[in-house]
Amino acid sequence: QVCIADDISLRGPRLTEQRSAGQGSCASATADLCVHGDWGRKCPNGCRMQGLMSHAEKDIGKRIGDLTERLARLGRLYTQVHTDFRAVSDTSGQTLNEHNELEVRYSEVLRELERRIIHLQRRINMQLQQLTLLQHNIKTQVSQILRVEVDIDVALRTCKGSCARYLEYRLDKEKNLQLEKAASYIANLKFERFEEVVVEETLNRRVETSSHAFQPTHGQGTPQPGHGTHSLSATSSITSAPNFVPHRQPTYVDHGRLSNPNEVAHSASSSSTHTSSSSSPSQPVSRDSAFPLPGSNTGTSEWDFNFHDESTPGNGPRDEAAASSSAHSPSTASHDTATSTTSFSSGTSGKDVAPLGTGVTHDGGVRTSGSLMDGGSSDTGTGGVSKTTTFTGSAQGGSWSTGGSTATNTGSAQGGSWSTGGRTEPNTGSGQGGSWGTGGRTEPNTGSGQGGSWGTGGRTEPNTGSGQGGSWGTGGRTEPNTGSAQGGSWGTGGRTEPNTGSAQGGSWGTGGRTEPNTGSAQGGSWSTGGRTEPNTGSAKGGSWGTGGRTEPNTGSAKGGSWSTGGRTEPNTGSAKGGSWGTGGRTEPNTGSAQGGSWGTGGRTEPNTGSAQGGSWGTGGRTEPNTGSAQGGSWGTGGRTEPNTGSAQGGSWGTGGRTEPNTGSAQGGSWSTGGRTEPNTGSGQGGSWGTGGRTEPNTGSGQGGSWSTGGRTEPNTGSGQGGSWGTGGRTEPNTGSAQGGSWGTGGRTEPNTGSAQGGSWGTGGSTATNTGSAQGGGGYAAGGTGAQTGSGSTSTHSAHSASGGMSSLDMLPALPDFGTWDMPDHSDIFSRRRVSTSSTTSSSSGGGHAGAAAGGGGDGASRFGSLFTTDFGPEFHEEFRSMLPGASRLSSSSSSSTRSTSSTSGGKVVTESVVTKVLSNGTTITHHTKHVSTSDGTGAASDGVSPLLTGRKTKAARSRRAKATRP
């Protein structure tokens, strides 16, 4: 339908679209957009443009929303993955750390296993060497038996026609043949020795195989191949190693006829100076060349006995032994030493020497299991084990070495220097005790002074120290310890830094410390636990810390300052005893006076006390105890903190104590029960501990310090009585003062001491005891020699193996006075000694001639040593002049004893006069005055000088004048 307008214009009517109801809204979204030529009916309006724009905006917004959601989802996924990765990384790191620790432990166990294998190898080698020596001895003895039988038969046949009585004697040729075959069989047994191989210290260890089947082969055959041992190889026979010729190689010479002059020349050359190495070893001198047995492979089939009696003067073995000891005997001016591949210098002052390995005690020296007591230098080894070099020493004791040492030890002074174990470098030291080392050390120890320096364990760096005790280290230390003074410095555990200290006690550290401890004065400074900072202190006792302390303790005065527990601040104090804190204290304790101040339990305030005895606490006290009086301080029950006191009685604790006791005064300090910390005390009685102690005891004063039970650490003390230990000790005892130091039980390390009485050891000791001062050197009993001079009634024999008489400037052989029961007093032959023994008339340990007054041990071990006690050179000359032909003096001469006792002022005065008249007219008088308290608290000398005098009769002087005429 077409609409016609009412008004007709010039253009005429136009067609118009019929509007619908929805034409008022925007155009459809499907309508096309306008172009330039489409304006008019086809062009959409603005409403349509608005719709298109809104549609596009929604589409773009939806896409942006999808991207945002995806981004958030990826973020959450990243967080989860990162968390899982961190967890896996932590677990892997922990596993790697554990694996690394296992590798380190494996390496340590491997090194320890190698060390033990090498130790076993060396012991096996020493045993094989001893077996070789025993083979040689058996063959020699069999040849001597056969020779003696033939000599007896010849002598009886010669006497048959001229003797009044004739004994029918027939040779049992069948038994002799069996004996000869058995000896030949034993002599032909060949043992292969291990040869040590050095391996690199890495996990990729070089494995060496061994052809050692560890079974003997017969004849001259080769050993059967076998599987080897880790890092060990055996390629050389015992016959190609440095051979071990006995010290007294007999020379069998018939001056009438000489079947083979080269044999005598070869035998004589074995006692001359000779040095060999493993590359060009020297063969042992075979006695088969002088005594070819029937059926043997060497020599002729006839018995050709060239024998020279040992008692005949000339080139016999006695002269060889005398020549070997000429450099060390005071009665011989010659310094020629007789050394071979093995140089056995006995220091016997011209006495007879039995073959090695027999355990025979010799006059002037003990030599058993490689232990040489007194007399110059030696190269004995263990049980006759030889070395390849000569050890030289000068002075009382000289120097020597035991084990597989291949280098020279040199020392001068009393004790010199020595080494034990697999040392390959020399030890050098001068002074009383010198220096030495034990274990697998490969670097030298150098020290001067009483005790010098030494090291134990797997140390690879030298220890250097000067003074009484010097310095040393134990454990896996790899850095040197340096110290000077009495005690010096040392370290235990896994320390890798040096300890330096000077004064009595010096400084040391225990545990995992990595920084040095430095201190000066008596006691110095030290630390225990996980400390990483140094402790510094000066004065008697110095300063130290225990537990998790990370800051230094500093103190000056007797006792200084220290701390226990979780303290993080220093303690400072001055005075006798100083100050310290225990438990969870965070503030310092300060006190001055004898005893100082301290705290127990959970105290947070200081305790202060002054007076004799100081203060103490018992049980669960939280308030301070303060007291003054004679008796000091102590605690009983379940105390876990230290007791400290000063005064008569000192301090001590009983029960389950785990902390140290410290005290000074008469009685010192000690502890019983399951103590695991050290006791320290100074004064009469010193300090000691009983039970399962594992830490050292240190004390100074009359009685020193000692320990009983399963101690494994050294005891150190100075004063009358020195220090010693009993039980299963494996470390050395060192002490200086009257009585020296010694050890009993299964000791395997040396004892060193200086002062009246020297030092010695009893039990199964296998190392050397050395002592200097009145009483000479030391000795060992229980397998290495005879022990004399112990107890209040002593047996003094001129043929004792102890005492170091070769170091005295007296006669080579002292008179045999027989068994002489001396008066029961320890202060005989000592001037102005003060005895602190708990008995009224005699000291514990007894002994005479230089014995300590306060439990001073056995004292000088030979009767002749008493002549060195404060008498001077005039008495020496007088005594030497009154004993011509001393060894021929009779011990059956008459003697008389007169004793008087009186009581005055609470004191018991006992005077004893012992007079002995020898067979040559010599009169020896012993006059002793002993003053002791009547209450049994102790015995004290009144300072009476010994009146040992030698009165020569007219007949004795006449005999001496005749003896001295040309």
Swiss-Prot record:
Residues 430-440, 448-458, 466-476, 485-494, 503-512, 539-548, 575-584, 593-602, 611-620, 629-638, 647-656, 682-692, 718-728, 737-746, 755-764, 773-788, 844-857 have a biased composition (Gly residues). It is found in: Secreted. The keyword Disulfide bond applies. Its main location: secreted. The record marks 11-12 as: Cleavage. GO terms for biological process: blood coagulation, common pathway; fibrinolysis; platelet aggregation; positive regulation of heterotypic cell-cell adhesion; protein polymerization. SMART domains: Fib_alpha. Residues 87-205 form a coiled coil. Residues 264-286, 322-349, 368-417, 789-804, 887-919 have a biased composition (Low complexity). The keyword Oxidoreductase does not apply. Residues 951-966 have a biased composition (Basic residues). It comes from the Eukaryota. Residues 1-5 form the signal peptide. Residues 391-786 are annotated as: 22 X 18 AA approximate tandem repeats of [FN]-T-G-S-[AG]-[QK]-G-G-S-W-[SG]-T-G-G-[RS]-T-[AE]-[TP]. Residues 210-223, 230-242, 515-535, 659-679, 920-936 have a biased composition (Polar residues). Sequence repeats lie at residues 391-408, 409-426, 427-444, 445-462, 463-480, 481-498, 499-516, 517-534, 535-552, 553-570, 571-588, 589-606, 607-624, 625-642, 643-660, 661-678, 679-696, 697-714, 715-732, 733-750, 751-768, 769-786. Not glycosylated. Keywords: Blood coagulation, Coiled coil, Disulfide bond, Hemostasis, Repeat, Secreted, Signal. A long coiled coil structure formed by 3 polypeptide chains connects the central nodule to the C-terminal domains (distal nodules). The long C-terminal ends of the alpha chains fold back, contributing a fourth strand to the coiled coil structure. Fibrinogen has a double function: yielding monomers that polymerize into fibrin and acting as a cofactor in platelet aggregation. Heterohexamer; disulfide linked. Contains 2 sets of 3 non-identical chains (alpha, beta and gamma). The 2 heterotrimers are in head to head conformation with the N-termini in a small central domain. This is Fibrinogen alpha-1 chain. It comes from Petromyzon marinus. The lineage of its organism: Eukaryota, Metazoa, Chordata, Craniata, Vertebrata.
